């Protein structure tokens, strides 16, 4: 008996024990609506590698990760998982796990090396994504494509500050149109931006993500930036870029291609630290400043009232024409969820040291009276709290007119400090996804229009500021050889998604 077959048999026995004990009994893909989509996700910079190959130009992340000290252990995505060369092997793994869909992003500078049409379209990049899309479809899966996952072209960052300038809107729409034109005959699910909150707040408020801008009183390492204004300006230009791309797609491509388009928004769920009115207010402000910042404009046409009232002229305004274009600019919403926090009201910040982080006047923590809200994960900012996902989905139904939702990221990590046999035994990940899926199921039964669930992530990969320390994948990747190994969770997913 081969090693692979032996491991598969052992895992089948392990699953059998769980089912006999009633732990996961009768809970499978058939517990969900027939058209529910199950998948897993990735991102170009975190996976592809080949950062100077195939005609690709540099992005802000290529630049940022090469600055010593910016990333843990000075890791980078130069090679990453070498998905650029190994994607056929990896798509076969997805098929083995019975996935319905694969979520991935298109690297802007692999299509437009200097970010602009004036620099020419890179035919090698187009060919790569055509081949990837075709292979995903040939394996019976749905490509779920993100147009922008934080990798702004370095040329545009150098030319006019990237998303700090409204000039980015036209450049982004040009890039999006190349994607629609080249791939839209086969891609039926588009998302314009992944987690614009993270890009804006971490790249321009904290300075810990590319392009690494912040006020000096936030961090001496940034060198340049304004944490009180730049996150809001960048987010505003993202809204305008998103809306313009959606408008283009709807008028020029959607009538014939018959696809759908939306935005992926990340948020936490929040619980009052105590039952006071002040802390309940802190919960709402916390939601407004991370979730409402992006949901309110695309659903209601403007930023939340708390943001508008408290930020004053630091928050850009939409013109009536822009508001009309932004409002309703989605066919579905992608929601990324990882954790829940307690929220406690705090006094207004020092007016001389304003920053996005303090503007919501709420302190968020995973602990109350020394006890965590849920088990603390390897990355200590995350707490495993499955009911939070259900509450978030119900809140979205109430506040945002029950939109079509895909849970586009949900996952748990472990550290890169275990032996291979230990790394493959990830029962905590099985429990994590099973419980979160049960709460998604509860939300559906309560009328929330959830249409899909994507794990984060397909394979262990480059995790931004933490480099390769955190492992979120269903597949273990040996960092020296890049060989892929299936974790126990991948076999659980395979069985969970098996069709009768």
Swiss-Prot record:
Which PROSITE patterns does the record match to this protein? GLYCOSYL_HYDROL_F1_2
Q: Which residues are glycosylated?
A: 63, 114, 363, 416-417
Annotated GO molecular function terms are: beta-D-fucosidase activity; beta-galactosidase activity; beta-glucosidase activity
Instruction: Enumerate the catalysed reactions.
Output: Hydrolysis of terminal, non-reducing beta-D-glucosyl residues with release of beta-D-glucose
Supply the SUPFAM superfamilies for this chain. (Trans)glycosidases (SSF51445)
Entry's InterPro entries?
Glyco_hydro_1 (IPR001360), Glyco_hydro_1_N_CS (IPR033132), Glycoside_hydrolase_SF (IPR017853)
Residues making up the signal peptide according to the UniProt record: 1-25
Q: Does Hydrolase show up as a keyword for this record?
A: yes
Q: EC?
A: 3.2.1.21
Positions with a binding annotation for a beta-D-glucoside: 46, 149, 194-195, 338, 409, 456, 463-464, 472
Give the GO biological process terms.
carbohydrate metabolic process
The annotated active site, in chain numbering, is 195, 409
Q: What S-S linkages are listed for this chain?
A: 214-222
Keywords attached to this Swiss-Prot or TrEMBL record, sorted alphabetically, are: Disulfide bond, Glycoprotein, Glycosidase, Hydrolase, Signal
Top enzyme class: hydrolase
Q: Where are the transmembrane segments?
A: none
**Family, per the entry?**
Belongs to the glycosyl hydrolase 1 family.
Q: What is this protein called?
A: Beta-glucosidase 30
């Amino acid at each position: 008996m081969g090693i692979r077959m032996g491991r598969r048999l052992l895992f089948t026995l392990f699953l059998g024990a769980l089912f006999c004990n009633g732990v996961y009994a009768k809970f499978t893909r058939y517990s969900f609506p027939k058209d529910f989509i199950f998948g897993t996700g990735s991102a170009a910079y975190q996976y592809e590698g080949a950062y100077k190959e195939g005609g690709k130009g540099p992005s802000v992340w290529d630049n940022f990760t090469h600055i010593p000290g910016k990333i843990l252990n000075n890791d980078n995505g130069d090679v990453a998982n070498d998905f650029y060369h190994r994607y056929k092997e990896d798509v076969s793994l997805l098929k083995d796990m019975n996935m319905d869909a694969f979520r991935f992003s298109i690297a802007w500078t692999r299509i437009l090396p200097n970010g602009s049409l004036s620099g020419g379209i890179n035919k090698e990049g187009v060919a790569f994504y055509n081949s990837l899309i075709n292979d995903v479809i040939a394996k019976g899966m749905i490509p779920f494509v993100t147009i922008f996952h934080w990798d702004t072209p370095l040329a545009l960052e150098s030319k006019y500050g990237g998303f700090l300038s409204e000039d980015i809107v036209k450049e982004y729409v040009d890039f999006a149109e190349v994607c629609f034109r080249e791939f839209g005959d086969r891609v039926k699910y588009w998302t314009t931006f992944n987690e614009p909150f993270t890009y804006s707040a971490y790249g321009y408020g904290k300075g810990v993500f590319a392009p690494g801008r912040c006020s000096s009183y936030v961090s001496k390492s940034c060198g340049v930036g304004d944490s009180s204004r730049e996150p809001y300006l960048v987010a505003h230009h993202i809204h305008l870029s998103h809306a313009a791309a959606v408008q283009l797609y709807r008028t020029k491509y959607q009538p014939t291609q018959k696809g759908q388009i939306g935005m992926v928004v990340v948020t936490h769920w929040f619980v009052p630290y105590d039952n006071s009115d002040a802390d309940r207010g802190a919960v709402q402000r916390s939601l407004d400043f991370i979730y409402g910042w992006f949901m309110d404009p695309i659903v209601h046409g403007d930023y939340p009232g708390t943001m508008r009232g408290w930020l004053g002229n630091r928050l850009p305004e939409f013109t009536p024409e822009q508001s009309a274009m932004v409002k309703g600019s989605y066919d579905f919403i992608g929601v990324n969820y990882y954790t829940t926090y307690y929220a406690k009201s705090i006094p207004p910040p020092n007016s001389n040291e304003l920053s996005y982080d303090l503007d919501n006047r709420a302190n968020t923590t995973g602990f109350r009276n020394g006890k965590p809200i849920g088990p603390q994960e390897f990355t200590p900012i995350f707490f495993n709290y499955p009911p939070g996902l259900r509450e978030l989905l119900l809140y979205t139904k109430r506040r945002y007119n029950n939109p079509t939702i895909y849970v586009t990221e949900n996952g748990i990590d472990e550290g890169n400090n275990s032996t291979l046999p230990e790394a493959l035994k990830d029962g905590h990940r099985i429990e994590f996804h099973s419980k979160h899926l049960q709460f998604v199921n509860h939300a559906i039964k309560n009328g929330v229009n959830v249409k899909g669930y994507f794990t984060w992530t397909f394979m262990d990969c480059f995790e931004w500021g933490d480099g390769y320390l955190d492992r979120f994948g269903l597949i273990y990747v040996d960092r020296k050889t890049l060989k892929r190994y299936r974790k126990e969770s991948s076999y659980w997913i395979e069985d969970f998604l098996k069709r009768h």
